[in-house]
Amino acid sequence: MKKIVFEKRDLSTEDSEAIANALMKGEIPEIQVSALLTSLAMKGESFEEIVGFARAMRNNAIKISYPEALDTAGTGGDGLGTINVSTITAIILSQLFPVAKHGNRSVSGKSGSADVLEALGYNINIAPELANKLIKENNFVFLFAQIYHPAMKNVANVRKTLGIRTIFNLLGPLTNPAGTRYQLIGLFSSKVMDIVAKAASLLDYKKVFIYHGEPGIDEISPYGYTTVYEITNGKIQQYRLHYSDFGLKRQIPIEKITATSANESAIKILRGVMGIDSDIRDFIGINVAVGLKLIGKAEDARDGFEYAMQLMESTIQHLRRIIESNGDIKKFDQLVRQVGKG
């Protein structure tokens, strides 16, 4: 720890993993944890440190084994309050590919993936033995971070007291308890893209897309350009996508795709997939399109967007089956009726 706190030097992957293991076992006093996390944030986390911490979090997680699945967990934290597009993207893609959606409560907007799924009627408190059953039944399961990463309770108080972004804000997407080897990762800042991409290239993934969109969202942007890092079997390729690459002929202002609560996010998501709100529909569509390319179901952005539009036609029925298996179907049906009337 002296290397970081006093000398501001990067830790090796091995040292980072050892320190993170000690943190999660509660072996380091809170005052030292606070100094460590603050020093890492001030110095800037290296990709070796992210790899080490991610491996420790994975080792300390309650695991389910479904490595050939996809996750769409982003970091959140962009502060712009967009609807939870990564969650509906996961649900739409699960019509074609198994998805183990790892998530938590809100970081950036008014609702995280856990919040919006609850608003739709889904039960987020899923034990590991049930998780395996659900993903086999419907190709989709939600893995609530608070259940599957119990060791994180040992740093929760310090993180809350500090009130700043720490290395743990980058780790959620890299620590899926199912060991998913396919991943869509939206980042809150373009400044961390290089280090997260390098870290992901060292973490046993088959294919990962990492992106950050204008004007500063952790999603594919309907407003301007999105920078994408595509990682395939450890090799990194970088490029940019513009909303026009998907076939969109208009810019969608960010205020058209935001929500102030989990319930509003859920309603707007349903309005999008039901074709009632074209701005939300297209925002969802471009994010699904990138996921379709990742899983090999689309050649390019435009092809993916067209396929995403087709998939949305069956999404309500698919989502209904998911909630019927694990949730409050009456709540969901009522919400769908409300949206349809409105």
From Swiss-Prot:
The gene is trpD. Homodimer. It comes from Sulfolobus acidocaldarius (strain ATCC 33909 / DSM 639 / JCM 8929 / NBRC 15157 / NCIMB 11770). Pfam families: Glycos_trans_3N (PF02885), Glycos_transf_3 (PF00591). Belongs to the anthranilate phosphoribosyltransferase family. GO terms for biological process: L-tryptophan biosynthetic process. Mg(2+) 2 binds at D218, E219. Mg(2+) 1 binds at S86, E219. Disulfide bonds: none annotated. InterPro entries: Anthranilate_Pribosyl_Tfrase, Glycosyl_Trfase_fam3, Glycosyl_Trfase_fam3_N_dom, Glycosyl_Trfase_fam3_N_dom_sf, Nuc_phospho_transferase. The lineage of its organism: Archaea, Thermoproteota, Thermoprotei, Sulfolobales, Sulfolobaceae. Its cofactor is Mg(2+). SUPFAM superfamilies: Nucleoside phosphorylase/phosphoribosyltransferase catalytic domain, Nucleoside phosphorylase/phosphoribosyltransferase N-terminal domain. It comes from the Archaea. It catalyses: N-(5-phospho-beta-D-ribosyl)anthranilate + diphosphate = 5-phospho-alpha-D-ribose 1-diphosphate + anthranilate. Anthranilate 2 binds at R159. GO terms for molecular function: anthranilate phosphoribosyltransferase activity; magnesium ion binding. Pathway: Amino-acid biosynthesis; L-tryptophan biosynthesis; L-tryptophan from chorismate: step 2/5. Anthranilate 1 binds at G74, N104. Transmembrane segments: none annotated. This is Anthranilate phosphoribosyltransferase. GO terms for cellular component: cytosol. Keywords: Amino-acid biosynthesis, Aromatic amino acid biosynthesis, Glycosyltransferase, Magnesium, Metal-binding, Transferase, Tryptophan biosynthesis.
